[in-house]
């Protein structure tokens, strides 16, 4: 087997659909509601492993998990006018209960800022209770009118982690924004997912936010996908819902809030970014199965049974050392057929055990990511597998970051930027004066989407590509999902 990435990069959409189906991650397009898929057992385990990383990082930083109702009354959703304008065309409405029309329409939760603020208004009365950090992992619903895509553009987003925090001051809320960004960096580092971090421009902020910071990654086809956002909401939602707290000086005022979310797209990026033409290569940190043992049959039944017994023994050794392992005991498939199956599931390590390994009390180790192989003694297999898993995790991370950085270019001319995006995709940084008019014109002329600008100071000794005034920073532009 050779490492090739033609199908993965040039026909990514087909590759992704094939992997989800054949790898038994996610069944999409066959459930009879557009934009809604079914998590299959193997994919659900991957999802749970990723959620576990998210939960651990949130729990360890003082976040408390809650669970809110799915339904939000229309009059409540409309309390924050900017917010509802941003979501109105995407809301699913429940208008009947049985055969009776409802007095008030109920929205299927598109996001929960208004719902959670409503209850915080009842629970939180004093600065002494702040800061307060809640989160939930739930389904949200968006009536997507564009072409839907499995895990990437859905009408039911089944893995929506939304955190909501409350603070006495603007500055403390900004400190929380910075903490959220650091949490997300740790999450994506655990997933070996590279990203660019930008502040969204004013015309592309989350509806109702003062500032929106976004994590974007580049998919194999060169398109960019948003994988996480952090919002400084200021007092917009607390003011709209008349939510006040007593401050240290005894006065009453509206608290400041933040919210931040990650969705199924993070899982999609894990499956997609580390792949090749044979399927995904799951990072060991989240792989449902870290090691698969494939027994190689002997020339006779007795020898084959001994090989199977030895294979099971090796797998049990690994499981006892918290390395998730399975032995493929299917006697009707050839080793080659088994290799194909486990490659498309993205299992990081394959152990091949046949008569030769049985006779020498050794194990043959094959890496999924770079095809390197090792033969080790039985007593060394646990330590060697741990070592190789760590190497795979780090190598996947390095390769992904190198790939992302290689696909970010600079262009001080709008035609050059357009050509790069049409031919290579990825991200193009263009010098920008900071005005909305020029930003929207950049989007129009490149036929692409503005991602935002770097949150760190980015000095540019160039002219804005539109108005030719001195540039204040760069604006990131990309073809997006």
Curated annotation (Swiss-Prot):
Gene3D superfamilies found in the cross-reference section: Anticodon-binding domain, Bira Bifunctional Protein, Domain 2, C-terminal domain of ProRS
Subunit structure, as described in the record: Homodimer.
SUPFAM superfamilies referenced in this protein's UniProt entry, alphabetically: C-terminal domain of ProRS, Class II aaRS ABD-related, Class II aaRS and biotin synthetases
UniProt-listed Pfam families: HGTP_anticodon, ProRS-C_1, tRNA-synt_2b
GO cellular component terms, semicolon-separated: aminoacyl-tRNA synthetase multienzyme complex; cytoplasm
EC number(s) reported in the record: 6.1.1.15
EC supergroup of this enzyme: ligase
Key words, A-Z: Aminoacyl-tRNA synthetase, ATP-binding, Cytoplasm, Ligase, Nucleotide-binding, Protein biosynthesis
Leader peptide range in chain numbering: none
Catalytic activity field: tRNA(Pro) + L-proline + ATP = L-prolyl-tRNA(Pro) + AMP + diphosphate
SMART domains reported in the protein's UniProt record: ProRS-C_1 (SM00946)
Domain-level remarks: Consists of three domains: the N-terminal catalytic domain, the anticodon-binding domain and the C-terminal extension.
CDD domains linked to this entry: ProRS_anticodon_zinc, ProRS_core_arch_euk
Name by which UniProt lists this protein: Proline--tRNA ligase
Keyword Nucleotide-binding: yes
Gene Ontology molecular function: any one: proline-tRNA ligase activity
Gene coding for it: proS
Purpose: Catalyzes the attachment of proline to tRNA(Pro) in a two-step reaction: proline is first activated by ATP to form Pro-AMP and then transferred to the acceptor end of tRNA(Pro).
GO biological process: prolyl-tRNA aminoacylation
PROSITE patterns, alphabetized: AA_TRNA_LIGASE_II (PS50862)
UniProt source species: Saccharolobus islandicus (strain L.S.2.15 / Lassen #1)
Subcellular location as annotated: Cytoplasm
Domain of life: Archaea
Family: Belongs to the class-II aminoacyl-tRNA synthetase family. ProS type 3 subfamily.
This protein's record includes keyword Transferase: no
